Every structure is written in structure tokens, then in C-alpha cells.
């Protein structure tokens, strides 16, 4: 089975955790677009945003998406990759898009437990809970529009991985 899986969702949804599990179980290569950007630019995302702005970061994100897309890969995308209509279309045309959907409170709780959450610049300058509520309000429709499958990210990473494998092996693509 030769496929490309794109995992989308907000920060804290579990894209990297689930992506690594899936890649391991499928013998695919795991790629995180944020890590790819950091490696190719030799800068942190915070530094890119602080020095060049969000617009430049979004352009780098779009370039990274196309650079890393290859068969037999699980690609964990940055939370804002769906802001570009071209990116949404590209992912739908080139693979299966899995949206890990989680509530703002769950996302905020997970982000507060991650040390790297302090390294990412705030999009709004508000508390993590308020920011995640605003981000989801602005992006939920875009995530849903892009996704072939929407999965409850409140489930354990192992259950999500099992569910995605069942979808893949059943040949269901919506």
C-alpha cells in the first residue's frame, strides 16, 4: 500500500505523537513540517516569526509541504498550514488528510505540559486557553474542509493509530 498521510490539527492535538506511531506501524517515514522548516532554515519557528513575520513563515510552511510530500510518508503539518487554500487543495489531491479534532481546553492543557510551547510565539497575545478558542473558531471549518477523515483527538494515540490503520486498509477515503 503506497499512500501519503497528512495529519492536520491545532497545536497540541497530537499530530506528532500519532504521526510517529502510525509511521512506525506502517513502516513509513515520519516527517514534521515544522521540524523540516527549522532544519532547512537553521532557525527556530519563533526566530523566523520574530525576524521575518508570520507571512514569511507561512510561505516557508507551504514550500516545506511540497518538499516533503512523498509516497509512504506520514506528514505532521503545522497547525496553520490549512490557512492557505492551495495547501488544503494540495493535501487533498496528493494524499489522505486526517484531522485530529480536539477542544480548546484539551489543547490548552496539553500545550501547558509541553516545554516547547513557550518557544512558539503567541498568535494572539492572550492566554493559551483564549488563544486556542480563537484559533479553533477561525480554523475549524478549514480543518473540516480539508480532511478526508475527522478523528476525536481526545482518544489515546494508540486508539487513533488503530482507527487510521482501519480506515487505510478498508480503502475508505471520503
Curated annotation (Swiss-Prot):
Mg(2+) binds at residues 16, 32. Substrate binds at residues 34, 58, 79, 139. ATP binds at residues 12-17, 120. Pathway: Metabolic intermediate biosynthesis; chorismate biosynthesis; chorismate from D-erythrose 4-phosphate and phosphoenolpyruvate: step 5/7. Binds 1 Mg(2+) ion per subunit. Catalyzes the specific phosphorylation of the 3-hydroxyl group of shikimic acid using ATP as a cosubstrate. Belongs to the shikimate kinase family. AroL subfamily. This is Shikimate kinase 2.
Amino acid at each position: 500500500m503506497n499512500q501519503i498521510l497528512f495529519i492536520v490539527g491545532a497545536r497540541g492535538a497530537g499530530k506528532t505523537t500519532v504521526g510517529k506511531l502510525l509511521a512506525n506501524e506502517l513502516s513509513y517515514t515520519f516527517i514534521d513540517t515544522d521540524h523540516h522548516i527549522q532544519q532547512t532554515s537553521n532557525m527556530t519557528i519563533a526566530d523566523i516569526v520574530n525576524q521575518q513575520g508570520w507571512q514569511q513563515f507561512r510561505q516557508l510552511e507551504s514550500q516545506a509541504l511540497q518538499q516533503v510530500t512523498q509516497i509512504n510518508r506520514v506528514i505532521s503539518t503545522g497547525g496553520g498550514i490549512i490557512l492557505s487554500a492551495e495547501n488544503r487543495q494540495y493535501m487533498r489531491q496528493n494524499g489522505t488528510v486526517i484531522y485530529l479534532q480536539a477542544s480548546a481546553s484539551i489543547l490548552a492543557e496539553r500545550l501547558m505540559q509541553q516545554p516547547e510551547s513557550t518557544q512558539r510565539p503567541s498568535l494572539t497575545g492572550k492566554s493559551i486557553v483564549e488563544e486556542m478558542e480563537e484559533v479553533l473558531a477561525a480554523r475549524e471549518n478549514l480543518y473540516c474542509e480539508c480532511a478526508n477523515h475527522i478523528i476525536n483527538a481526545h482518544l489515546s494515540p494508540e486508539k487513533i493509530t488503530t482507527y487510521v490503520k482501519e480506515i487505510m486498509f478498508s480503502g475508505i477515503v471520503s
